[in-house]
Amino acid sequence: MINPLLELKEVSYKNKNNFTLNKVSLRIKSGEKIALLGKSGAGKTTLISILNGTLKPYKGRVKLFNTEFDKLNLYQKSKISTIWQDLRLIEDLSAEQNVNCGLLAKQSFLFAFKNLLNISSFNKAHQYMQVCNLKKSIFSKNIRKISGGQKQRVAIARSLIQESDILLADEPFNNLDPKLTSNIKNLLLITKNKNKIKVPNTTLISLHRLDLLDGFNRIIGMKNGEILFDLEKTKLKKYHLNKIY
């Protein structure tokens, strides 16, 4: 059996007195395009936070590349990038500086700090911003002065510049119009790269819109901190969805 890229074994997470994840087991293999479904409060954000190491499980084990997460070095952890639902942009920086923050994942803080504000280091950031349909006119603008949809795409470009193997995304299509949603979804689920940039080969994206399921090959449904179904996209039926909505 091929080892998964990322694995949870009987993971539970406790927030105060409540379990927001309850004995969740999950194996993510290379090349999978996974949609994570469930109502607000189902545990999707907690699951993503456990998968990327932001939260430590109350019980259970998390492995990346068959290695316990707490034993990984900085470079190994950088193989996972995340698009957060609340974006987590730095308001005192420009759009291009925020994108460059994605480089923090692979570099020491001192190196990144010295180069973050260096204009000559923005070429790569601009490339990823353009792929995310951001116009040159907003590159140097303070993040406070751009629209919600533009901020969303800055956060996406920041995750892509990290050039990770695995992308975790929490509702990444909020604030995007239908055309941009389609373009960005195709970018995140890409199988043939026409833009000559590195895009993660493996993705897990939480969604609430069922009309966005095209392009995914695996669907996971959550409710009350538990996985109620985990199946191939072709096997998804209405009764599965009725379990979680």
Regions flagged by a language model, labelled:
Residues 52:
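Helix-to-loop junction immediately C-terminal to a conserved catalytic motif
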Residues 37-39:
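The feature captures the beta-strand-to-loop junction immediately N-terminal to the Walker
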Residues 156:
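Hydrophobic anchor residue at the start of the ABC signature
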Residues 178-180:
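Helix N-cap at the start of a conserved alpha-helix in ABC-type nucleotide-binding domains
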Residues 142-146, 150:
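Conserved ABC ATPase signature
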Residues 68-84, 118, 238:
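ABC ATPase NBD coupling module
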Residues 167-171:
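Catalytic Walker B motif of ABC-type/P-loop ATPase nucleotide-binding domains
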